[in-house]
């Protein structure tokens, strides 16, 4: 299935039904009085997170989603039926934003989480509500309110604890396949990875974390070079970034330091907050460097790169150094997970408008119009 991580849709909630202006007309009941019922409420549009869906491809082609209108009220105190709701199933990790106002509507981070996207209009009042001691036969009634109409932007940001950064062919896919059960495509040409891959790394019976591999970046990605830098959105939820560097490039004219600096520059162009995220340097392909040259090459790289953060030397192909790196990652995440989760919850509390969402009366398949 084609991986789609962005879509734009229009959601239209149902209009409320009009109230009825009716009088009771019945044999042997003179002056029966008003009996016009209220209109039904318009249907709502909900989004629900579903872990069985992993792409937004359904919403790339079905762009308009409508809930049903409420029925009009009728005589004999008959109230109109409420419009059926529409439920849109989306992948866990989907962020929903109002394109007109920029408001963050929802951040679907848990399976089954349900959020209202558009609220149906209230039904109008029938004339029985306007009866009084001075107006025994009112003919007033109110019309139903229109439902909300919104243009929404959907963005899928995968849920991972660790993100991999690096140039094409830096060994990211080889690394994730060596430490997890993920089976990404691996080849000796650039841009083998075309979509994010997730792998679960287990360091104990009940100790694990999720790692995300995204397509490689090159210098100028912010201007559209290579595959661009839009895949960096999938690293925004991570707790730590691993910057993989090919320490033994096949082309002798390639400078690993220049490539590493280019990656950092692209990261900063995309998002300052992502640039400030904890980042570890992972020097890969040490098995390709002669043992007597390794220490000098590593020292030269660190000096020219001007790096004073955590450094790990590994070979993703042979597994050298990978186990120690995974244990260090788990220990770091365990130590900082509470603070990371608290920060995310604080952001949601201030930026996301969650509305109470009762169980939907009706639903629609992903991408289906009501």
UniProtKB/Swiss-Prot annotation:
Top-rank taxon, per record: Bacteria
Cofactor: Mg(2+)
Annotated ranges, domain OBG-type G: 160-334
Broad EC category: hydrolase
Segments for region (Disordered): 344-370
Pfam families linked to this entry: GTP1_OBG (PF01018), MMR_HSR1 (PF01926)
Binding-site positions, Mg(2+): 173, 193
Full protein name: GTPase Obg
Coiled coil residues, start to end: none
Keyword terms of this UniProt record: Cytoplasm, GTP-binding, Hydrolase, Magnesium, Metal-binding, Nucleotide-binding
Record function comment: An essential GTPase which binds GTP, GDP and possibly (p)ppGpp with moderate affinity, with high nucleotide exchange rates and a fairly low GTP hydrolysis rate. Plays a role in control of the cell cycle, stress response, ribosome biogenesis and in those bacteria that undergo differentiation, in morphogenesis control.
Residues at which GTP binds: 166-173, 191-195, 213-216, 284-287, 315-317
CDD domains noted in UniProt: Obg (cd01898)
Subcellular location: Cytoplasm
Key word Cell membrane present: no
GO molecular function annotations of the record: GTP binding; GTPase activity; magnesium ion binding
Gene this chain is encoded by: obg
Family note: Belongs to the TRAFAC class OBG-HflX-like GTPase superfamily. OBG GTPase family.
InterPro entries documented for this protein: G_OBG, GTP-bd, GTP-bd_Obg/CgtA, GTP1-OBG_CS, GTP1_OBG_dom, GTP1_OBG_dom_sf, OBG_GTPase, P-loop_NTPase
Ranges for domain Obg: 1-159
GO biological process entries: ribosome biogenesis
Subunit structure comment from the entry: Monomer.
GO cellular component, as recorded: cytoplasm
Keyword GTP-binding: yes
